[in-house]
Amino acid sequence: PGIKTIHFVAPQVWVWREGREKKIKKFIDHILLLFKFEKKYWERENVSCEFVGHPLLENNKEVKIELNQVIKKNKAIISVFPGSRDSEVKKLTPILLEFIKLMNKKYEDFLYVFHSTKAQKSNLENIINKSQINNTEIISDERIKDHILKKSIFAVSKSGTISLEISKRKIPSIIIYKMNFINFLIVKMLVKIKYANILNIAAGQMIIPELLQSKCNSKQIYKLVSSFLEDQNKIKKQISNTEK
């Protein structure tokens, strides 16, 4: 009693259905927010709050790495983010590999770099090796991953905070995600937001295309990525919108 409570990283009340703000405000005195758009949700409940920014967007440390020391193939890079959980890697990686096979029929000059956690690297290697696709690499070192991303011409990413880092690097991208159908139905009942991507949620519109559930398949990913690669104006428009 009498001790003031400051909460860093606000509960995502903008994701879940109404009512959580009223319950949470009983236990906190002040909230430090990662995103500007969150402020309106807390101010309408008269909760003291302030925007402090997201560490992913504020980190400006640069690590100089010679790209040819890491990636031996002299090809344009497309970064691929299949997720960090077992369920994500097992569900999304086969879809992404089928997407790459489709891309290889049309484009010969791309290298697909899978960004992995150290814990998932072995699992990812096993899945990719079975595909016999020879224009892929797996990177798990965080410093190298950031450098690879900066050199990428495009990114295909699972939904999550990585989209902030991709946006910060001004890399055009799309978002994919697929979960168990029962889990999807449960989430759909609980969640009130229209979009899965944090940038789309903040903007209130579809800036980064999302392929979710049944739309998350190799043909749809191929079609969407190709449409960007063949239209520089589309790429410029997306990057411009993420900077607003």
What do these predicted regions represent?
Residues 1-244:
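Nucleotide-activated sugar donor-binding and catalytic core shared by glycosyltransferases
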